[in-house]
């Protein structure tokens, strides 16, 4: 083990010295995610979110003379985890909603994660193409390859070491942007602790945390307005880490 000892005048100088050894992004995250609050539906409604509540939330923000910055539509906007399209029962006119939020001055982002539940078209398509992390061992009483993530149904994980799988996922996100005018995404999860026991990826990982690095570098970095909650060796990626 190598141990480096530093002697500097104060904590600020020590921090600056340490930061100087890390990669820096070519550009910072967009100003709108730093200078003003990110208004997330999760803080107000948790999973009980829909189109009318989202618009009501935005109008209340403006009525209280607070800044219109980023409106982040969080968990349960999809019909199923990983579908990457709106639940039309809860959001009957997604394009109209996004247009109205834009007119009010908000940028609009959506919550996404690299996990897909079984009872979805995304799972059927991705499974046929071999786009998910696999496992020959069960996690508890779940099917091989499946695991529990928070309070979601059992899910599988996108294989971020597989370039075709990454392109498939990113293409579906960009389709959302084109169809509805979405400005960016909140990229949740990405930690290897959620993955199934004895998991296998197309490209072998040097250590499990490389899954996190690939999630940020290969997916989140493809979008100008991106927020992540985790990172590993990704200080050079110009995304907001919350």
Where are the regions that the model predicts?
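Aromatic- and carboxylate-enriched substrate-binding clefts and catalytic-loop regions
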Residues: 67-242
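Carbohydrate-recognition beta-sandwich/jelly-roll modules
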Residues: 1-69, 95-100, 104-108
């Amino acid at each position: 083990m190598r141990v480096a000892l530093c002697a500097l005048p104060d904590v600020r100088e020590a921090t600056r010295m340490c930061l100087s050894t890390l990669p820096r992004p070519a550009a910072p995250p967009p100003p709108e995610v730093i200078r003003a609050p990110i208004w997330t539906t999760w803080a107000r409604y948790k999973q009980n979110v829909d189109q009318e509540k989202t618009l009501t939330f935005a109008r209340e923000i403006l009525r209280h003379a607070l800044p219109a910055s980023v409106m982040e539509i969080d968990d349960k906007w999809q019909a199923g985890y990983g579908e990457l399209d709106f639940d039309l029962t809860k959001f009957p006119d997604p394009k109209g909603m996004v247009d109205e939020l834009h007119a009010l001055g908000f940028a609009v982002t959506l919550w996404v994660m690299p996990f897909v539940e079984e009872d979805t078209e995304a799972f059927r398509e991705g499974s046929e193409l071999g786009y998910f992390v696999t496992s020959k061992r069960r996690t508890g009483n779940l099917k091989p390859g499946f695991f529990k993530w928070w309070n979601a149904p059992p899910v599988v994980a996108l294989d971020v070491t597989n370039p075709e799988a990454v392109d498939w996922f990113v293409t579906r996100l960009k389709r959302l942007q084109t169809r509805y005018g979405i400005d960016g995404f909140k990229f949740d999860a990405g930690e290897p602790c959620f993955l199934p026991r004895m998991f296998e990826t197309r490209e072998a990982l040097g250590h499990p945390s490389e899954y996190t690095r690939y999630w940020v570098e290969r997916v989140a970095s493809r979008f100008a307005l991106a927020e992540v909650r985790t990172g590993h060796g990704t200080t050079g990626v110009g995304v907001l880490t919350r």
